[in-house]
Amino acid sequence: MPPPSEGALVIERAIQIRTSPGRVLSAFFQPRDLAAWWGVSNAVTVARPLAPYAVQWPPTHYTDEVLGQLGGTLHGTVMDIRDGASFFLADLYYTPPEGAPIGPMALEVEAHPIGDGRTTEMSIRQSADDNGARWQRYFGVMAEGWDRALDALREHLEWAGVRPHRGSIWERR
């Protein structure tokens, strides 16, 4: 992943998951998987270039002091996809239940086998060039959200969907 430009907002996370890279990446495109690990209520995610990628979360009971009510929709365009290795989303926007969208952003996800090939190292990088207060707050909320979501992804894939109940990725711990 290239280094961020000066003034850019970036979230970078990496995690190891005991499954294949293909299985990890497919969990970003299968509605049942997305519901299980990311808590989405609706998904239109097509794993091919120039196709839509849209996920929706139900509105939360929590209201952020800057962003308002959380939940809403994250939508963009699949620009590149490499089977079992990576995908890149561009023109990515977060639209909260109320208020103006935040975007455009980019999301890159990469997955590589490590060790004996039964474990995958997956990395995500979400980035944007804007730097206003609302953007900074969104990236702060999403940094925590990605931590919870990736933990849930690992639990979902390693435990075949049998995991303790978790609240929405938007809810505070």
Where are the regions that the model predicts?
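Short acidic N-proximal helix/loop "leader" segments that mark the beginning
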Residues: 1-12
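Short beta-edge strand/loop motif at the mouth of beta-sheet-based domains
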Residues: 12, 32-73, 165-172
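Hydrophobic/aromatic beta-strand elements that line small-molecule binding cavities or substrate pockets
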Residues: 13-15, 73-80, 104-113
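Amphipathic alpha-helical segments
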Residues: 18-36
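A short, structured loop/turn motif at beta-sheet edges
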Residues: 21-22, 46-50, 79-86, 110-121
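Hydrophobic pocket/interface hotspot
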Residues: 24-25, 34, 53-55, 78, ...
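Beta-strand/loop substructures that line and gate deep hydrophobic ligand-binding cavities in soluble
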Residues: 94-147
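A conserved amphipathic terminal alpha-helix motif
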Residues: 128-173
